Amino acid sequence: MEAYDQKIAEEEAKAKEEEGVPDEEGWVKVTRRGRRPVLPRTEAASLRVLERERRKRSQKELLNYAWQHRESKMEHLAQLRKKFEEDKQRIELLRAQRKFRPY
């Protein structure tokens, strides 16, 4: 079994060396793996994804009618406008105090 494991490890190392290197005719061998490794699906990551999907689904379930969608969008836009005005006032205050340095 150890000999088999060693043989597999050697083959993987050889494949990794040859990956992306053109042969004598200029062809590049395409493998199953991508260039970047895929993030492993840990339990914490899968829980975060499930939580995000559940939150999104719960919001959609609450909004059954078109007018509810419109109202929620309008509320969201109102919140964004309010935050923008607050930020604008804060910047004006900093400019008045000559402490505003955007860069």
UniProtKB/Swiss-Prot annotation:
Pfam families assigned: RRP7
Gene Ontology biological process terms from the UniProt entry: ribosomal small subunit assembly; rRNA processing
Record's compositionally biased regions (Basic and acidic residues): 1-19
Keywords: Coiled coil
Cellular-component GO terms for this entry: CURI complex; UTP-C complex
TM annotation in the entry: none
Residues in coiled coil: 71-100
Keyword Zinc-finger tagged: no
InterPro entries recorded: RRP7, RRP7_C
Region named Disordered: 1-25
UniProt keyword Coiled coil present: yes
Family of this protein: Belongs to the RRP7 family.
Protein name: Putative ribosomal RNA-processing protein 7 homolog B
Lineage of the species this protein comes from: Eukaryota, Metazoa, Chordata, Craniata, Vertebrata
Gene: RRP7BP
